[in-house]
Structures are given as C-alpha cells and as structure tokens.
C-alpha cells in the first residue's frame, strides 16, 4: 500500500486530520458498497440503470467499496492525438488505452466513440465502457470552445457500454444549447439502462478576474454541479475547487454570504464538500478530475487530490493524463496509488 502521509509531506496533518465544521457528514449520502440499494433506489431510474451502476461498483481494485477509479482518454479529440500521445505512441492504438485501464484495475474506461468502438468486441465484456458523446476539438480555427455531439446514445448502447458521458460548458454562450442536447441524451440513456456522467465544466473569460481563475472556485463549480444533477447526471465530474468567491469577483448571478462564512472554509476538503453538497448532498456522486500531467509531482498531486475527494465525501477520481503520458508500468503504479487512498480505512470522511 502507498505511504499516503509520506507523500503528502507537510500537508499531511491539515488533510488527514481535518474535521469539517461546515456541512456535517451525517447530512450526506456517502459512497459505500450499498450505495445503489441505499441511495439510487429512491430515484426514478429503470432497474437496468441500477444494474449498470452496480457493475461499475463491482469492477476493478475498488470493486465492492462504492468508490470509482476511471481512466478517461478522450484527449485525442480534445487536445489533439499528437499532443496527447507523442510521449507514448502506443496509445495511438485504442487497444492499449483499454489495456491500461484493465492492468490498473480501474472500474471503467472512458473514451470516444471511435476508440471504444474499434475494440468493443474484444473488450466490452472485460471492463465497463463509458462512451463520451460530445467533444471540443481544436482543429477548427479560430477555436470556439464549443461541445459538438460526435455519437448517439444508441451507438454507445449497441457497443455494450454501461455508461455515457458528456461535457457542458456552463457559463458559455453555447451552454443553453448544450443543456438541451445533453438533457435529451441523458433521458434516452436512462431509458436504455445506461448510467450518465456529466463533465460539468465552466467556460467564460469573465471567470478570470484580477489574475485569479474562478473556473475552479467552489461557489461557481458548485452551481455547475447543481445544474448537472438537475438534468439527470448520476455522476458529476468536476475540477477540484482551488479557490472560492467567484460570484463576488465577477459580480454576477446570485449567492449568499453564508456560503463563505458557514458552508465553506479555506481548507480544500471543505471546498470540495461544498461541491458535493450541490450534487444533491451526494445523491449524484462527485468524482474529481486528476488534472494535467506535471512531471515529477504527478504522484503526490494525484494522491493529494484523492485524499481531498474521499475525505470530502466524494466518490472517486477520474485520472487520465497523469497516467497515459507515462510508461504503462508507471501509469499503472500511479493509478494504483490513487486507488490505495480509497482502500485505506485510515483515510476517513472529515
């Protein structure tokens, strides 16, 4: 098992010993082996959705814990294949993307329709597939930062996927169209029995103010999570909160001083706890992003993110670039270290 405290270094006490005095843990719907029976059973989802959610929970090293470790590799579209895979050309072959997820003991592999369809007959029965339905691509010039549908829910269903995912750029000029598209797609996915995952991202230049990037503020991302749950996301993928006070900084929208005085603090665990509260207190699971590859600090950064997510009450981590931009052996090692956080009973809910 990974020595978590050693990796956290000087931050170990503030992260591992923190007690949340903002939103109590007993008000949350926390992950666990019985999450489907305890939480999802209340929803209007068809039985097949519950079955597929349980399939996700039963797979990989975290099987039976209620936590999720997902490998996402859609960057070939989002960031260009060359930029994504030049460090490891073997990942130009979709087979190796899926093999990385299997070798690392992930609950699920998430990728584009093309990647997963090209190997679906070989792998769909070996590891759960999550098909990403829409993407932003950077070949169009000038870049517009919009999300375009690349595949249908039926295409994902027919290849044997248990889940579909999509991104909405909340706050962007195109967000209302995206909300309509993805709300309809999630409705169709649920009818076919698939789990729905929303990348609930913010996108607006106005969210950068005085040198601070409020795309990762707890209050604004929290509202994005609330909108994600509103359109039927079973799981919400969100960037980990790094600051707060986005509403006040941009001087737009609605907030309340108690969000900052009572419901959050400066501790990152409390900021993520607020993100989770906006996921209907955990009725929709919260998974945080692993972030960009950063070199020598990747292992420490990934474990730190996992500790914050777990202690806040989150459901897991969706980590891609930090893993597939390394050798497969090193990628497996990094993902396993993240999983060790969720397997370690000493890392408790704050």
Language-model segments: which ranges?
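N-terminal amphipathic alpha-helix/helix-capping segment at the start of soluble metabolic enzymes
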Residues: 1-79, 84, 117-126, 274
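Alpha/beta enzyme core
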Residues: 23-30, 63, 76-109, 114-287, ...
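Hydrophobic alpha-helical scaffolding
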Residues: 43, 265, 295-296, 328
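PDZ domains - specifically the beta-sandwich core and the conserved carboxylate-binding loop
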Residues: 289-291
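Histidine/acidic-residue-rich catalytic or RNA/ligand-binding cores of hydrolases
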Residues: 297-303, 327-336
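A short, acidic, flexible beta-alpha connecting loop/helix-capping segment that sits on the rim
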Residues: 321-327
């Amino acid at each position: 098992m990974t020595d978590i405290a050693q990796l956290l270094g000087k931050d170990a006490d503030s992260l591992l010993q923190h007690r949340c005095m903002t939103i109590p843990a007993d008000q949350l719907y926390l992950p666990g082996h019985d999450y489907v029976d305890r939480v999802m059973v209340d929803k209007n989802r068809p039985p097949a959705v519950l079955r597929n959610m349980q399939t996700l929970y039963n797979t990989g090293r975290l099987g039976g814990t209620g936590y999720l470790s997902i490998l996402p590799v859609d960057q070939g579209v989002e960031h260009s294949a060359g930029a994504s895979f030049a460090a490891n050309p073997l990942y130009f072959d979709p087979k190796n993307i899926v093999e990385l997820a299997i070798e690392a003991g992930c609950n699920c592999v998430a990728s584009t329709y093309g990647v997963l369809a090209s190997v679906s007959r070989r792998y769909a029965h070996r590891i759960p597939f999550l098909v990403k339905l829409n993407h932003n691509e950077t070949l169009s010039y000038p870049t517009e930062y919009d999300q375009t549908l690349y595949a249908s829910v039926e295409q994902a269903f027919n290849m044997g996927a248990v889940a579909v995912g999509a991104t909405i750029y909340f706050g962007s000029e195109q967000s209302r169209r995206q909300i309509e598209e993805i709300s309809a797609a999630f409705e169709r996915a649920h009818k076919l029995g698939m789990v729905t995952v929303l990348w609930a991202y913010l996108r607006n230049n106005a969210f950068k103010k005085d040198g601070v990037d409020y795309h990762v503020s707890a209050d604004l991302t929290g509202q994005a999570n609330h909108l994600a749950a509103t359109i039927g996301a079973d799981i919400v993928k969100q960037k980990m909160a790094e600051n707060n006070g986005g509403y006040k900084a941009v001087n737009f929208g609605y907030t309340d001083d108690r969000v900052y005085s009572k419901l959050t603090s400066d501790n990152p665990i409390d900021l993520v706890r607020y993100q989770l509260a906006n996921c209907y207190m955990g009725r929709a699971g919260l998974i945080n992003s692993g972030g960009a590859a950063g070199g020598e600090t990747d292992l420490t950064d990934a474990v730190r993110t996992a500790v914050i997510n777990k202690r806040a009450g989150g459901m897991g981590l969706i980590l891609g670039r930090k893993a597939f931009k390394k050798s497969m052996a090193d990628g497996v090692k990094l993902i396993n270290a993240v999983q060790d956080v969720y397997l370690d009973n000493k890392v408790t809910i704050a």
